[in-house]
């Protein structure tokens, strides 16, 4: 994403030259861990509407840039500033590329994957993997090594062009949220299997769990206006009970990638959903509900079960108490299917990328910056500069002689959002492991653990333990590359075919056996070729070098 000048001048041939690794042009001098004289890092990143500054501060002058200058001798400068809304950042960056404008040292981005691939394919970025191996701290390397496949989206010709921005692992992996007060009232047992769950759904649908004398409740809320396998009000786990996960590429027993929506288990899951629709266990409007709208059926007191991430007590589950102050909800594990299988979609450890301009004079300066955040901010020790947060008066304050992160005391500022990588630094496993530790009744001993304990509701802590206890059932999206040639041509047709067929089967407008014809048509309409291309990509990125 950086230096484009030389690129467009040579693109009339259609060839892309591989960028040579960046080599420091001048040795930097450090005194007491700080560059002296200071070094400047120019950069680009989108600025979202969730980022707010104190009066007198802005993107180039704030508590974070002051910290970088005072502590590390690094002067951070935006090449230009653009908001992330309405694709403004993407539009301006593409215009800069087209006009051969000068690019900054660093581009840090989370958003449109096609833009990332466009930038990588310009050949203007170094093999960041080589720089990472040379300059990254042990803490950062260990965090990255928790899942090396996080590099895959940013690889080209075996080179790691972009450095993945790490996020907390399992953050979107689902658990089953059930109205616990309804469970108690109807004397129901925890569901371990789909059969157990059907008993609960039948009771929620037919035994008046809210006690209002009306038949106005049902079992499970889902929404598949977008997809069945989705981030909230999810139905992917139903397919997991039959050994697959739809709308993603899964690793099969032969070590090959397979599109989950054409796996035979999908037919069984669709038959199950059709049965539940007929019995009134799921909403008749499920096909037009998106994720948020479907979840509102739970918070409105209509549905007794919703499946989604461990953080749902923060939003939107507490809204159920607006309708019924005595309402209770509890997290349960994902149940297994008739053959003992259970599955849920997994969540990537990556959430964005950093690209380094091949013309950056001193790329090691970026690693000095990010290493410090991984070593001191990601999981600070007692007495460390970031023990209570990034900066007093911003994300933490003293109240009654104790540090607090309560927004009423701090003003609700989040200086980690000012950083080059949007969140400061995150060790993927740390958040969920901390939550699981607290759920087991262990004492919070580290600053990170104490911060989590003080700010996270107990149901969320309990749910996190379930997520970790069931980590072996997670099924990750294994294709994370750019759309293949045939995908670009045929994906719209294939997606419409899939959505239409699945919806018709669930609603009973087509027989379950229509799935077999769908698979045949999917393969003939480009799916077979896409499968070949996806596996060629997978072999290229996963091959041992």
Where are these regions (language model features)?
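Extracytoplasmic/periplasmic substrate-binding proteins
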Residues: 47-65, 170-177, 184-190, 224-281, ...
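Carboxylate/His-rich catalytic cores and anion/metal-binding grooves
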Residues: 113-152, 201-204, 213-250, 305-318
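Short, solvent-exposed loop/beta-turn-alpha elements that line the ligand-binding surface or hinge
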Residues: 33, 127-146, 189, 245-264, ...
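Helix-loop-helix "hinge/cap" segment bordering the ligand-binding cleft or interdomain interface
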Residues: 129, 155-230, 251-293, 297, ...
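Conserved small-residue motifs centered on glycine
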Residues: 368, 375-500, 509
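Paired acidic/hydrophobic, glycine-rich loop segments that form the ligand-binding mouth/hinge
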Residues: 104-108, 304-309
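C-terminal motif of bacterial Sec signal peptides marking the signal peptidase cleavage site
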Residues: 6-10
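Conserved N-terminal structural module of periplasmic/extracytoplasmic solute-binding proteins
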Residues: 11-196, 258-259, 468, 472-545
């Amino acid at each position: 994403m950086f230096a484009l000048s030389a690129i467009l001048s040579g693109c009339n041939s259609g060839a892309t030259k591989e960028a040579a690794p960046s080599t420091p042009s001048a040795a930097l001098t450090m005194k007491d861990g700080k560059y002296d004289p200071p070094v400047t890092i120019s950069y680009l990143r989108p600025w979202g509407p969730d980022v707010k500054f104190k009066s007198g501060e802005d993107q180039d002058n704030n508590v974070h840039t002051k910290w970088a200058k005072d502590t590390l001798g690094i002067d951070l400068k935006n090449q230009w500033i653009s908001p992330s809304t309405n694709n403004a950042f993407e539009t301006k960056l593409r215009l800069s590329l087209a006009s051969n404008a000068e690019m900054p040292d660093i581009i840090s981005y989370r958003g449109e994957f096609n833009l990332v691939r466009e930038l990588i394919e310009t050949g203007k970025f170094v093999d960041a993997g080589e720089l990472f191996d040379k300059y990254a701290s042990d803490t950062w390397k260990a965090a990255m090594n928790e899942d090396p496949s996080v590099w895959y989206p940013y690889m080209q010709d075996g080179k790691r062009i972009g450095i993945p921005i790490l996020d907390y692992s399992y953050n979107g992996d689902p658990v089953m949220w059930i109205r616990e007060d309804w469970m108690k009232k109807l004397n129901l047992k925890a569901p371990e299997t789909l059969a157990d769950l059907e008993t609960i759904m039948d009771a929620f649908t037919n035994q008046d769990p809210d006690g209002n004398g009306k038949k106005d409740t049902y079992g499970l809320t889902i929404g598949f206006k977008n997809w069945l396998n989705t981030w909230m009000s999810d139905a992917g786990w139903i397919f997991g009970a039959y050994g697959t996960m739809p709308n993603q590429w899964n690793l099969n027993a032969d070590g090959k990638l397979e599109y989950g929506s054409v796996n035979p288990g999908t037919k069984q899951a669709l038959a199950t959903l059709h049965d539940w629709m007929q019995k009134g266990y799921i909403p008749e409007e499920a096909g037009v509900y998106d994720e948020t709208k479907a979840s509102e059926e739970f918070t409105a007191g209509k549905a007794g079960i919703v499946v989604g991430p461990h953080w749902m007590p923060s939003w939107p589950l507490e809204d159920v108490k607006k309708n019924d102050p005595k309402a209770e909800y509890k997290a349960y594990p994902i149940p297994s299917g008739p053959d003992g299988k259970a599955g849920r979609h997994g969540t990537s450890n990556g959430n964005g990328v950093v690209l380094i301009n091949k013309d950056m004079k001193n790329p090691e300066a970026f690693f000095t910056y990010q290493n410090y955040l991984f070593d001191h901010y990601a999981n600070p020790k007692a007495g460390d500069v970031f023990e209570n947060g990034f900066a007093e008066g911003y994300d933490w304050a003293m109240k009654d002689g104790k540090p607090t992160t309560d927004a009423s005391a701090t003003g609700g500022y989040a200086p980690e959002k000012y950083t080059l990588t949007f969140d400061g630094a995150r060790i993927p496993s740390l958040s969920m492991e901390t939550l699981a530790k607290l759920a087991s009744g262990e004492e919070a001993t580290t600053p990170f653990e104490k911060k989590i304990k003080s700010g996270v509701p107990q149901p969320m802590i309990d749910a996190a333990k379930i997520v970790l206890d069931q980590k072996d059932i997670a099924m990750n999206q294994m294709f994370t590359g750019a759309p293949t040639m045939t995908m670009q041509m045929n994906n719209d047709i294939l997606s419409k075919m899939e959505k239409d067929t699945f919806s018709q089967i669930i609603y009973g407008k087509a027989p379950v056996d229509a799935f077999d014809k769908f698979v045949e048509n999917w393969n003939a309409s480009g799916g077979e070729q896409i499968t070949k291309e996806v596996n060629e990509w997978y072999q290229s990125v996963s091959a041992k070098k």
